[in-house]
Amino acid sequence: MKKKTTLSEEDQALFRQLMAGTRKIKQDTIVHRPQSKKISEVPVKRLIQEQADASHYFSDEFQPLLNTEGPVKYVRPDVSHFEAKKLRRGDYSPELFLDLHGLTQLQAKQELGALIAACRREHVFCACVMHGHGKHILKQQTPLWLAQHPHVMAFHQAPKEYGGDAALLVLIEVEEWLPPELP
């Protein structure tokens, strides 16, 4: 720690002489404006509504036609098949991960809906959904649910480093990002 320097008697007398006639300021603090909320903070009510809206697309009765041979994959008709190839090769690395282990089908649908809503809100293009092996219920249902959602562009069985055949890499269609307007 730095050693304090002491003033000589002469310097102290000079200081008192210079400060004679001054008075104490009543208030010398600056009041700052309250910080504005972060843009990414979303009210809880809105999050719950987004989650419910996103899980609305998942039906157990509708069975989309998916290729049953080879790895699990899907590409929306208006999306290039090259995107699925890039997913397979691991060109996209997921920014969000969802683990469905131990969830019921209803909970899994809600969590998938929340994941897609979060990806769109946070402008995340690629996510990983880990459904696991288990009794193969979620493993079979997850691709069927994802293929029904309009914001899912493509998905492919994940490479080994992201879970292999117990996980899917999902490409999400995100809105174009616009910077927030300043007040």
From Swiss-Prot:
<dbReference type="GO" id="GO:0072344">
    <property type="term" value="P:rescue of stalled ribosome"/>
</dbReference>
<dbReference type="InterPro" id="IPR002625">
    <property type="entry name" value="Smr_dom"/>
</dbReference>
<feature type="domain" description="Smr">
    <location>
        <begin position="98"/>
        <end position="173"/>
    </location>
</feature>
<dbReference type="Pfam" id="PF01713">
    <property type="entry name" value="Smr"/>
</dbReference>
<keyword id="KW-0540">Nuclease</keyword>
<keyword id="KW-0694">RNA-binding</keyword>
<comment type="similarity">
    <text>Belongs to the SmrB family.</text>
</comment>
<dbReference type="GO" id="GO:0004521">
    <property type="term" value="F:RNA endonuclease activity"/>
</dbReference>
<keyword id="KW-0378">Hydrolase</keyword>
<keyword id="KW-0699">rRNA-binding</keyword>
<dbReference type="InterPro" id="IPR022990">
    <property type="entry name" value="SmrB-like"/>
</dbReference>
<comment type="subunit">
    <text>Associates with collided ribosomes, but not with correctly translating polysomes.</text>
</comment>
<comment type="function">
    <text>Acts as a ribosome collision sensor. Detects stalled/collided disomes (pairs of ribosomes where the leading ribosome is stalled and a second ribosome has collided with it) and endonucleolytically cleaves mRNA at the 5' boundary of the stalled ribosome. Stalled/collided disomes form a new interface (primarily via the 30S subunits) that binds SmrB. Cleaved mRNA becomes available for tmRNA ligation, leading to ribosomal subunit dissociation and rescue of stalled ribosomes.</text>
</comment>
<protein>
    <recommendedName>
        <fullName>Ribosome rescue factor SmrB</fullName>
        <ecNumber>3.1.-.-</ecNumber>
    </recommendedName>
</protein>
<dbReference type="GO" id="GO:0019843">
    <property type="term" value="F:rRNA binding"/>
</dbReference>
<keyword id="KW-0255">Endonuclease</keyword>
<dbReference type="InterPro" id="IPR036063">
    <property type="entry name" value="Smr_dom_sf"/>
</dbReference>
